[in-house]
């Protein structure tokens, strides 16, 4: 039996060596697979992080762009409010000019106009009583306007209302006001 025991022992010893060899190979293969999977996971992580970083930068850039645009729009709105305020002050100043200045303006403006004998002069309401007896070489209407003056020629109205005059020059005035107030 000892021969049989030797054979069995030898077979067991060979099986044990083979088992160790197989386990060794399996462990090495396992380590390679784990290493490969870790590398793949790291690459995927890097890809995801780069994509997330890129998306975050895109979101940040879009948000920053919106903030800049909103800020610019607010600045433009504020500038427009200032310009509108200046235009209103111009209208108010013209409307509230002294009687003497109004009379000079009126005389000067009328001298440049080709007036007919049927034309009617419509004066500014707050200046009417003071100027109704003046001679402007044109008939005086009983009607009044809020500011400036008008000439009535039949059904035609030549409007020299200060508000209308300023409004008709608004584009040019806005440019000049902006240049003066907001030059860099």
UniProtKB/Swiss-Prot annotation:
A GO biological-process term: proton motive force-driven plasma membrane ATP synthesis
InterPro entries: ATP_synth_B-like_membr_sf, ATPase_V1_Esu
GO molecular function: ATP binding; proton-transporting ATP synthase activity, rotational mechanism; proton-transporting ATPase activity, rotational mechanism
Keyword Transport assigned: yes
Keywords assigned by UniProt, alphabetized: ATP synthesis, Hydrogen ion transport, Ion transport, Transport
GO CC term, one of those recorded: proton-transporting two-sector ATPase complex, catalytic domain
Keyword Ion transport tagged: yes
Family statement drawn from the similarity comment of this UniProt entry: Belongs to the V-ATPase E subunit family.
Function: Produces ATP from ADP in the presence of a proton gradient across the membrane.
Name this polypeptide is given: V-type proton ATPase subunit E
Organism: Finegoldia magna (strain ATCC 29328 / DSM 20472 / WAL 2508)
Source species taxonomy: Bacteria, Bacillati, Bacillota, Tissierellia, Tissierellales
């Amino acid at each position: 039996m000892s021969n049989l025991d030797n054979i069995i022992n030898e077979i067991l010893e060979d099986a044990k060596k083979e088992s160790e060899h197989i386990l060794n190979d399996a462990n090495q293969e396992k380590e390679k697979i784990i290493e490969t999977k870790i590398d793949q996971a790291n690459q995927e992580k890097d890809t995801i992080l780069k994509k997330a970083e890129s998306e975050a930068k895109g979101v940040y850039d879009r948000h920053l762009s919106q903030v800049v645009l909103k800020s610019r729009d607010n600045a433009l709105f504020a500038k427009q409010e200032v310009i509108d305020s200046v235009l209103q002050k111009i209208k108010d100043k013209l409307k509230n000019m002294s009687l003497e200045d109004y009379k000079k303006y009126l005389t000067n403006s009328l001298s440049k106009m080709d007036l007919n004998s049927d034309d009617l002069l419509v004066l500014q309401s707050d200046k009417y009583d003071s100027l109704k007896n003046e001679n402007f070489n044109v008939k005086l209407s009983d009607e009044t306007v809020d500011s400036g003056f008008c000439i009535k020629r039949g059904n035609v109205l030549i409007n020299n209302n200060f508000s209308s005059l300023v409004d008709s020059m608004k584009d040019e005035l806005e440019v000049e006001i902006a240049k003066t107030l907001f030059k860099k």
